[in-house]
């Protein structure tokens, strides 16, 4: 049905947001993660690679492919995936790179900081914290919430994605990340607790073990900032 829709609508741009995105669960069901994040990508792009109507394919990738690092990563950083989720996403990316090199497939890759905003999946840390607080449940913070992340609002991500559709370069990777520093997850939860008048200590379970997730990564987004003279609109 999807292929019929492609030929019916003949889109000049396709943005692939579809993915199995939960890192911890990728250890439980790696086959499903590879089927969605790699095999499905191969099937879709194998169909699209010969379509004259397609001018741009945006692959929404992930910085998890770099593994844990304290560096401010550029787009040329080497890959070191440490979870089935990251490895499955990288496998899909590498296939797309081969299509670009062989057929000049019009792919652009985006790798964003942690995205937040309206209609976010409820298992993500910000909506999950709010739901748990309101329902009287304690929030489990693996690794005691010491993992560090940067956050970018979906409006900024959407704006940059549209700019890349119109003015990006095929075969290139672009980091989408804010100007401010990365923060510990526990500090994000603590801020939400304060805004909703809850005590952090009474609302969280600090679990020492942090199974299957990178402790930290940060992205250098100067490439996209310089290309479009962009500054984040929401922080």
Features from the language model and the residues they span:
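A glycine/serine/threonine-rich, flexible loop-to-helix segment
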Residues: 122-130
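Residues at the N-terminus of a long alpha-helix
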Residues: 80, 118, 150-153
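N-terminal Rossmann-like NAD(P)+-binding domain of SDR-like oxidoreductases, especially those catalyzing
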Residues: 1-115
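C-terminal substrate-binding subdomain of Rossmann-fold SDR/epimerase-dehydratase oxidoreductases
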Residues: 133-235
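Conserved active-site region of classical short-chain dehydrogenase/reductase
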Residues: 38-46, 123, 155-158, 162
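Hydrophobic alpha-helix immediately C-terminal to the catalytic Tyr-X-X-X-Lys motif of short-chain
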Residues: 91, 95-99, 129, 188, ...
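Short coil/turn segments at alpha/beta junctions that flank glycine-rich nucleotide-binding fingerprints
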Residues: 102-106, 122-123, 167
């Amino acid at each position: 049905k999807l292929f019929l829709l492609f030929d019916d609508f003949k889109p000049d741009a396709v943005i692939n947001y579809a993915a199995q995105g939960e890192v911890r669960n990728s250890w439980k069901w790696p086959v499903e993660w590879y089927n969605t994040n790699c095999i499905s990508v191969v099937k879709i792009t194998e169909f699209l690679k010969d379509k004259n109507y397609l001018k741009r394919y945006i692959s929404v990738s992930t910085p998890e492919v770099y593994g844990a690092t304290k560096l401010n990563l550029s787009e040329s950083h080497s890959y070191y995936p440490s979870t089935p989720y990251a490895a499955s996403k990288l496998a899909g990316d590498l296939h797309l790179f081969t299509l670009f090199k062989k057929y000049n497939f019009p792919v652009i890759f985006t790798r964003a900081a942690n995205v937040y905003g309206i209609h976010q999946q409820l298992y993500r840390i910000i909506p999950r914290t709010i739901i748990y607080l309101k329902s009287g449940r304690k929030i489990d913070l693996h690794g005691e919430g010491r993992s560090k992340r940067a956050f970018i609002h979906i409006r900024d991500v959407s704006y940059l994605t549209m700019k890349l559709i119109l003015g990006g370069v095929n075969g290139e990777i672009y980091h989408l990340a804010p100007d401010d520093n990365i923060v510990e997850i526990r500090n994000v939860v603590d801020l939400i607790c304060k805004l909703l008048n809850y005590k952090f200590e009474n609302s969280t379970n600090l679990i020492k073990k942090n199974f299957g997730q990178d402790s930290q990564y940060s992205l250098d987004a100067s490439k996209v900032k310089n290309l479009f003279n962009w500054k984040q609109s929401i922080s």
